[in-house]
Design a protein with these regions (language model features):
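Short, basic (Lys/Arg/His-rich) helix/loop patches that form interaction surfaces
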Residues: 102-143, 147-150, 159
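Short helix/loop segment immediately N-terminal to the Walker
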Residues: 66-81, 115-117
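Catalytic-site neighborhood detector that most strongly recognizes the C-terminal catalytic loop/helix
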Residues: 145-171
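Aromatic/pi-system hotspot detector in well-structured domains
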Residues: 58-69, 81-86, 105-108, 132, ...
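Conserved tyrosine-mediated DNA breakage-rejoining catalytic core shared by Y-recombinases
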Residues: 11-57, 67-72
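C-terminal catalytic core of Y-nucleophile DNA break-rejoin enzymes
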Residues: 37-61, 81-104
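C-terminal secondary-structure termini that scaffold catalytic or DNA-interacting sites
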Residues: 46, 164, 170-178
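Short pre-functional
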Residues: 1-7, 129-130
Length: 178
């Protein structure tokens, strides 16, 4: 739902997911070089990604689960604790690593779960494509994805709008008769 890069997501701390409390919830992407899992924000650019109510509720449920696991294990959880953590294997509640995510994806793919050839980055591309197909301006998509320049977004996703326009032209007869 966010279009974040894997490294951005893995570097999040609990306090960087800000609940809306009557306003729009958001994730604050903070560049840092001290993540215990080595996760990094590309080009070290901070940004804010607004999220919907469904993801906000999912976060609240996830945080409750993490807090319960932490309490059972005697592990302290604070705003500066990693957001995405190990829950199935040691070290318990340690920052999730990229290799762990990629291993899980490989397992899911071997089981035939998900589209053929999908990767974590596939979700970022899908997010951007869906936004553009919904009519979101390119500059908004560019900022949401953290691209340094809108031209990067156009280079990667310009075909989406082109294809959409070409599909619309399939109904040329209705345009010609009006």
């Amino acid at each position: 739902e966010t279009g974040m890069r894997l490294g951005e997501a893995l570097g999040l701390r609990i306090g960087e997911f800000v609940l809306g409390r009557g306003d729009t919830a958001y994730v604050q992407i903070v560049p840092r070089s001290d993540n215990p899992n080595g996760a990094r924000v590309k080009m070290m650019r901070p940004r804010r990604v607004y999220v919907g109510a469904d993801l906000e509720r999912l976060f609240a449920d996830y945080l409750t689960d993490i807090a319960c696991r932490a309490a059972e294990s005697g592990i302290a959880v604070t705003d500066t604790s990693p957001l995405l953590v190990n829950v199935a294997r040691p070290p318990l509640l340690a920052a999730l690593r990229e290799t762990t995510v990629r291993e899980k994806v490989a397992t899911l793919r071997r089981r035939g779960i998900g589209p053929l050839g999908w990767t974590p980055h596939w979700f970022r591309h899908t997010h951007a494509t869906a936004l553009l197909l919904a009519g979101t301006p390119e500059w908004v998509v560019s900022r949401r994805l953290g691209h340094a320049h809108v031209q990067t977004t156009l280079d990667l996703y310009g075909w989406v709008r082109d294809d959409e326009a070409l599909r619309a032209a399939a109904n040329w007869a209705s345009y010609a008769s009006s």
